[in-house]
Amino acid sequence: MSSESTKNRHRSSKRTPSPLQKERKRNWENRKSRSRSPIRRHGEKNLEYAHHNNQDNRQSSYTASKTSDQAMKTKEKTSGGTRTNPYTVFSQHRANHSNAPGWCGFYWHSTRLARNGTNNIFNEMKQKFQELQIDGKISWDTTRELLFTQKKTLDQGYRNMLYHFRHSPDCPRCDYWDDVYRKHLANVSSQESEEVTDEEMLSAVESMETNASN
């Protein structure tokens, strides 16, 4: 066989794929198609899941908000819209008893210390943070110094209270005001006790101090 005829046969085989080559090509294209389709289905499934998840989140948020609103309405209805703490009780008592002694007692001092801590956060600590912050941030060293400053202030208040109770066990003012608040607690109807928020405590104290100065 001549070399020329061999070359022509080779060219012809390259131009016209054999049945076996066609079958292999078909199988390869089918495999590629199958490998891509799960990705599309998975993507579509993920989009569907994300949409469904967003709907669930909105529904959960709405349900939580509705439950919170209902709980708040129930709480307001139960409490009758009146919430008391030692400051409000003592202020009302003094308004009706002009000869009442100066403030003192466990309930008075414990509430006063709580007020001091709240006032320290909302006023002094906030002001110091604003002075020291850079882009709304402070370093750990600065945070530590602020915390120790607050701790020193609170520690001194507790030491003063403990010193008074230790060295004045028979303080008549303590007995008087503790008795006033105990009687108030005894007369309160059997409702769930409600914790007074820091903002409410601070507001009550400021109002009380204003009345005392007048």
UniProtKB/Swiss-Prot annotation:
Organism (species): Human bocavirus 4 (HBoV4)
Biased composition (Basic residues): 33-43
Keywords: Activator, Host nucleus, Transcription, Transcription regulation
Biased segments, Basic and acidic residues type: 44-55
Biological function: Required for the expression of the capsid proteins. Performs the splicing and internal polyadenylation of the viral capsid-encoding mRNA precursor, which allows its maturation and expression. Transactivates the viral promoter.
Lineage: Viruses, Monodnaviria, Shotokuvirae, Cossaviricota, Quintoviricetes
One GO CC term on file: host cell nucleus
Similarity comment: family membership: Belongs to the Bocaparvovirus Non-structural protein NP-1 family.
Region annotated Disordered, chain positions: 1-85, 192-214
Polar residues composition-biased segments: 56-71
Chief location category: host cell
Superkingdom of origin: Viruses
Compositional bias of kind Acidic residues: 192-201
Name the record gives this protein: Non-structural protein NP-1
